[in-house]
Amino acid sequence: MSAYAFLLVVLALVCTSALYFFFGRLSRFPCRTIRDVPAFLQPVDSASMMQLLNPETEEYLHSAMTGLALRLEQRRSLHFLREHLIRMSHNAHILLEWSNAELKREIVGQSEEYSECYRDCARQLHSAAIEFRLYAALSLFKIKLWLVFRTQPWIPLEPPSLSDLGHVGSLRFFTLYSNLTRAVSNLGQHYGPEFCDEVLKAWAVAA
């Protein structure tokens, strides 16, 4: 490939990316208030996820299954984890938009102490949502690699350890999920228990 052709490819990629982000900005959701949060959240089975990421569950699985049966069971578990991580990442995006709107909102008729506490809660949610989305993106990439290369019976690689998905570098699922849930609760409390409960129920899996 000549230098001229390479330059054209780079320019095409840059223009495509610019158009993608431009259209994304035009089609983004308007200022997301707390009333716009519950209806857009997707239920997630966090309890089952935590069980799958538990090292004790991993040990039991390896002791009870071997070979093809183990790899097939791991593929099922990885697809389950991927589905719920996608939902969690979506939810974190919704919560991030909410926190952005709250940080821009002007607080009228309240003390300076209350206003600062309110903004601090919004900042905590903003930070927690960003961290969780980063963890989810890295974990989803890791799951894709495992599904392709580590769970195929014809590829001579050791089966993966699902508990390793509990952390990506310094990002730990249990800590990040707890931080995100706590931040949602803290900010939601400023709107009263009814609004707070509505958001948290939408965030949890249906019983």
PLM regions: where:
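N-terminal signal-anchor transmembrane alpha helix of single-pass membrane proteins
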Residues: M1-P38
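Cytosol-/stroma-facing membrane-proximal "stalk/adaptor" domains immediately downstream
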Residues: N100-A207
